[in-house]
């Protein structure tokens, strides 16, 4: 095995680096957003840590609702509950249709899908190299 391949294998199997205080704060915000989604009965909530594989965002929160009305309610809950913490979305997409609502907070992005849209876009497969946060 070449040195590069050997280094890749070591890096791939290494435990994640400890989080800085700023990263801990971001993760707390991400977990709070996931808890807000859970309050509105979101299903299959998943947090992915992307910081090791991309630079555009540190985390994804991915969840599902059973209808477009529910996905919109989940989005509303998250945005309203994060406001007191001075967290406002940089951008929101898909709210009107509700099949896939994307709420971009910069350091993390919330994806709220209907069941069928989640299966179709399959972000879990697309970002399968990301660390799953418990």
Where are these regions (language model features)?
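Long, contiguous binding/interaction regions
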Residues: 1-47, 52, 69, 73, ...
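Glycine/charge-rich, flexible interdomain linkers and switch-proximal surface loops
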Residues: 44-56, 90-107
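Short hydrophobic/aromatic beta-strand micro-patches
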Residues: 62-64
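Active-site cofactor/substrate anionic-group-binding motifs, chiefly glycine-
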Residues: 78-89
